[in-house]
Amino acid sequence: MLIKYCGIRSKQDIALIEKSAATHIGFIFYPRSKRYVKPERVNEFVTDEIKKQVSLVGVFVNTPVDQILEIASVTNLDVIQCHGQETAADVRQLKQRGYEVWKALPHNKETLQQMHVYEEADGYVIDSKVKEQFGGTGVAFDWSFVPQYESAAQRLGKKCFIAGGINACNIENLLPYQPGAIDISGGIETNGTKDYTKIIEIERKIIL
C-alpha cells in the first residue's frame, strides 16, 4: 500500500517520517491552510536521506500554473497535487513540464465522471466534500464507494489515494475496502503536531 503523510512542516516531522513506512510526504503550499509551509523553508529541513525514502508532493489550491512550476522547481518536488478547481488543461500543462500530477476530487455523485475528465492526471486523491474547504477537514466520506474508485482508477492506469478523516481509530473500517493508497494528515497529529505513536498505531493495523 502507498502511504502519504501530509502537512509536513518541520525538521521534527521529517525525523518521524524517516522511521515510518511512508512512501510519499506532502507539503501544503496553500496559505489559508493551518498546515501551510513556506516553499523556501522546505529545503531547510528536507534531507537527502528522506528524498531517497519518499516522493515529495506539493499540494496546491487554485495556484497559477507558472507559480506552481516555480515552487516545484525550488523545492525539488516529485509530484504536484492539484487540490482546488484546477482544469484538465492545467493538469496537462504541468505534465508537459515533466512532473507527475495528481488531481484531488471530492467524493460526490460526479466523482467517477470527474476521474475521466482528468484522465491525463497520473493519480487521484479522493477526499471528503466540505463546503468552502479544500482538504484537511478531518471528515471521512462513505468508504463503501472506495472499490468503485479503485476499479475506475485501475482501468485508467492511475494511482488512487483515499483521504479525509483517516486515523488509528477508524482505519480498520477502511481496510476491508482494499484501498491501494491512503493520504493522512490530521490522523497522525496530536494538538496540531505530528505524533509518532499515532503513525505506528496506523501502520501496525495496515500491516496486520
Swiss-Prot record:
HAMAP family found in the cross-reference section: PRAI
Keyword Transmembrane helix: no
Transmembrane regions listed in the UniProt entry: none
Top-rank EC class of the record's enzyme: isomerase
Enzyme Commission code(s) on record: 5.3.1.24
Keywords: Amino-acid biosynthesis, Aromatic amino acid biosynthesis, Isomerase, Tryptophan biosynthesis
Name of the protein described by the UniProt record: N-(5'-phosphoribosyl)anthranilate isomerase
GO molecular function: phosphoribosylanthranilate isomerase activity
Name of one Pfam family that matches: PRAI
Family: Belongs to the TrpF family.
Organism: Priestia megaterium (strain ATCC 12872 / QMB1551)
Taxonomic lineage: Bacteria, Bacillati, Bacillota, Bacilli, Bacillales
Gene3D superfamilies associated with the record: Aldolase class I
Catalysed reactions, as listed in the record: N-(5-phospho-beta-D-ribosyl)anthranilate = 1-(2-carboxyphenylamino)-1-deoxy-D-ribulose 5-phosphate
